[in-house]
Amino acid sequence: RLAIIGSGFLAWVVYQYLNAHYFFEVDVLGKSNKELWGDKLKDSLDKTYDIVIDLNTRDEVFTQDLVTEQGLIVLGAEKSNGITTRFEKLLWNAVTVVFPSPRQKNFKRCMEMAVKMIETGALDIDKFWSKGYDRETEWQDAFKESDYRMPGFNRGYIEWL
């Protein structure tokens, strides 16, 4: 079993990749993009998981019992408020923690793979972005409409090219 902490764009990309290439039972902890995630989205996690991919700034991965013995944590987000932990459960359970980074040898290859997956339709991002805005003439509308979202509006983006 696998848990993704965070329900934004990066979580959606990770989920789409895993769903296309692996057979995991996936739960997603988050509050955003409810229409997109459907029943995968959870308000809390009450199980343990073989793999936890943490893409959020909160500290659940360190404060809750989420990872099985010899499990894996992929820590993909800085903890903006800091964390307080003694790591005793992670140490006792021989949990592996990895930190993805642009300095990691496979990072560029992963980004190239994501581009190909989007181009071929293997990674479906159509439901994630609702509207594009011209950066010269509509940038203020992008922020306004994002703050006061109409039904069906998920996310907007500003076109830079």
At which residue positions do the language-model features occur?
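Short loop/turn motifs at secondary-structure junctions
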Residues: 22-25, 48, 69, 124, ...
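A short acidic, Gly/Pro-enriched loop at the edge of an enzyme's catalytic core
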Residues: 44-52
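Glycine-rich phosphate-binding loop and adjacent beta-alpha segment
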Residues: 56-122, 160-161
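Short, well-ordered alpha-helix to beta-strand connector turns
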Residues: 38-39, 49, 70, 94
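C-terminal hydrophobic helical "lid"/dimerization subdomain
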Residues: 3, 7, 13, 108-161
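Mid-domain Rossmann-like dinucleotide-binding core that forms the NAD(H)/NADP(H) cofactor-binding site
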Residues: 1-43
